[in-house]
Amino acid sequence: MPLLDSFTVDHTRMEAPAVRVAKTMNTPHGDAITVFDLRFCVPNKEVMPERGSHTLEHLFAGFMRNHLNGNGVEIIDISPMGCRTGFYMSLIGTPDEQRVADAWKAAMEDVLKVQDQNQIPELNVYQCGTYQMHSLQEAQDIARSILERDVRINSNEELALPKEKLQELHI
C-alpha cells in the first residue's frame, strides 16, 4: 500500500496548535489545491473530546470560510482527523501558513461568540449523523485553548522522518 504523506512526518516532534502544509497538487486544469494539517493537539499527548470536536466541525467550516475565502482561495472541505488531534482543510489556492493561522484564530474567536447550542449549524436529525453528540461548552474550551496557546507553523522539513526510520518501521 502506498505511504500517505501524513505518515512521513514525525508525530513525536509535532507542535500544536500549528498549521502545516500537508500536500499540494494541481488539477488537470492547472488549479492549485493545498491540504493543510490544522493540528489542535500534540499527537499522542492530547486529544479533543468527541462531542466538542464534533460541534467544532459544524462551526469551524463556516467560520474559516468567512475568514479565508477570497483573494484566490476557496475552501473545499474541513474534516476532523480520526485521531482527534486536528482537522484537515482542503482548498483551492496556495495561501501561506500565516494567513491560514490568522483565519484559524479569527474562527476560534467566532466559536467563543456562539451563545447557544441552537446556533450550531445543521444540528438536526436530517443533516447530522449523530446530532445528539454535541457540546458547545467543549467546543468553546477547545477554541479558548487555541487562542491561549497561539498558532505556530509546523515545517515539513523539520518533521520529516528519515528514510532509515521509515525502513525500520517497515514502511
From Swiss-Prot:
The gene is luxS. InterPro entries: LuxS_sf, Metalloenz_LuxS/M16, S-ribosylhomocysteinase. HAMAP family: LuxS (MF_00091). Belongs to the LuxS family. One of its GO terms (molecular function) is S-ribosylhomocysteine lyase activity. One of its GO terms (biological process) is quorum sensing. It holds the Pfam family LuxS. Keywords: Autoinducer synthesis, Iron, Lyase, Metal-binding, Quorum sensing. This is S-ribosylhomocysteine lyase. Binds 1 Fe cation per subunit. The keyword Lyase applies. Homodimer.
